[in-house]
């Protein structure tokens, strides 16, 4: 930490909870990256082992007799799904790490602030309300506050 303070890094003054949170986000991203590397290596190995290399005088236009298209398709779908899931998780965890997001609610707040939602909300709140909307809002507030008693039994 003294080295970080020496070079004037702001993270040197961060709370231990913040440092632990950032460490957790980094570990999630690194784990997803490791899973992506292992999955891509598995996909490469499974592709190489299924590769058909004909002998010198065999035709290379038809697969061997013991070839099973169903199992090959199942392996391809499984491998593609694993690759897609691992890369997607790596992108998701990396984005959350960069944006310092740990929950879906924080993600919503961060996106709202990045897209100017708080400014638009403030502008909308500052606009004057028309008479009909104010009447409806006051009526609903009276009902919620218990100032109006609704009697549905009388006809």
Curated annotation (Swiss-Prot):
Keyword field: Membrane, Transmembrane, Transmembrane helix
Major location (coarse): membrane
One GO CC term on file: mitochondrion
Highest taxon in the source lineage: Eukaryota
Transmembrane segments: 27-44, 77-99
Compartments (UniProt record): Membrane
UniProt cross-references to InterPro entries, sorted A to Z: AIM11 (IPR038814)
Membrane topology: Multi-pass membrane protein
Family: Belongs to the AIM11 family.
Protein name: Altered inheritance of mitochondria protein 11
